[in-house]
Amino acid sequence: MTNLLWQKPGVAVDAKIQSFLAGDDVILDREFFLHDIAASKAHAQGLQHIGILSPQELDGLSEQLDLLAEDFRGGAFVLDEQYEDCHSAIEARLTERLGDAGRKIHTGRSRNDQILVATRLWLKDKLQRVATLSAEIAKVALDRAQAEAELPVPGYTHIQRAVVSSAGMWWAGWAEAFIDNAVRATDTLQLVDSNPLGTAAGYGVNLPLDRAHTTAELGFARLQVSPIYAQLSRGKYELAALEALGSATLDLRRIAWDVSLFTSGEFAFVALPAQYTTGSSIMPNKRNPDVIELMRATHASVAAARTEIEQLLSLPSGYHRDLQSSKGAIVHGFGRGLAALELLPALLANLEWRPDKLRAAIDSGMYATDVAVEAAVAGVPFREAYKAAAEASDTAGQGRTPEGSLAARVSPGAAADLQLDVLLARWETLR
């Protein structure tokens, strides 16, 4: 490893210790590299504004930073273990190409605020993707709720048959859930949308840095004012972002559970397209819903990332190297979470209900609640009506149909009044 920015003259570097210090940092930094380049370009512009760089030096730095980004995207520049991290790679490249102008780029900043701004930009991108995917999932669910509003589906509590429900109600539930998930991701994006660049190591610098310029140039909504808080917010903002992602993957886990049950032979309510299943290495008859099961497992990875960062934050104020580990947590958490969410819209759009199996699973006792409510409407005290319906639950379905039960369910949001227009109006505000 070369280009240690902090190495002091006459002090030897122990290779094993340095390897431990670096860990997999430079590999993880590939996620943040383009954001670090963009922030370096904005920082250079700010330095030119206060006379640290000449216009000619700024032009050279801007050109080389653009070329570095292009080379990285195209594979001509590889961020690997010869560098300690992405920050040293940028400075080494600029110094190699531009000499003293490259050596000036770090004036007024620390790797502390450098990684803060790069990860902050990265989190904004990821949260926007969570919001977009959540909105896409909600729209698929809304469309299917409208199309299948009257399709009877058994309703369960405690995984026991309970009442007659509908595909419309099932889809509307997931639609509202993912509308909320989109809102939460957007709200969290607004929280993290503050610029820490220019806070240096966490105590500011004796330069009149043009932080207003870097805030605008990098597209931040506001300046993160306090250098102390800039360091305190590292981990805190990552935690908030993972919580927003976790809100979506938690619902993903539950919808995957439903689909896993519904595709089993014991239920057989739903047919999955073949591309969402795999086979067994020994049992020729098997079609395994592995995609659904791995979706269900995704939330565990997100929750683990959240827990890792939460445990890292048992620290006093100021920067601590412990926080380096937060990078791996967010990369792995968002990597797993977004990969699963990306598959969900198409999966939901291609689910096929099996109406004969759905209807066969609706038994007489599932009308007992209807009988009790109807008696209460007729003037019988509900508790008495409940007892009578319980005693006659085996015959409660006589003369009744699933469609009739659904048509009578007129409370707002229930089967006869799904209020999809209300949900659609909420969805429209997401765009």
Swiss-Prot record:
It is an enzyme of class 4 (lyase). It is found in: Cytoplasm. It holds the Pfam family Lyase_1. Keywords: Amino-acid biosynthesis, Arginine biosynthesis, Cytoplasm, Lyase. Pathway: Amino-acid biosynthesis; L-arginine biosynthesis; L-arginine from L-ornithine and carbamoyl phosphate: step 3/3. GO terms for biological process: arginine biosynthetic process via ornithine; L-arginine biosynthetic process. GO terms for molecular function: argininosuccinate lyase activity. GO terms for cellular component: cytosol. Its main location: cytoplasm. Gene3D superfamilies: Fumarase/aspartase (C-terminal domain), Fumarase/aspartase (Central domain), Fumarase/aspartase (N-terminal domain). Its EC number is 4.3.2.1. It catalyses: 2-(N(omega)-L-arginino)succinate = fumarate + L-arginine. Belongs to the lyase 1 family. Argininosuccinate lyase subfamily. This is Argininosuccinate lyase. The gene is argH.
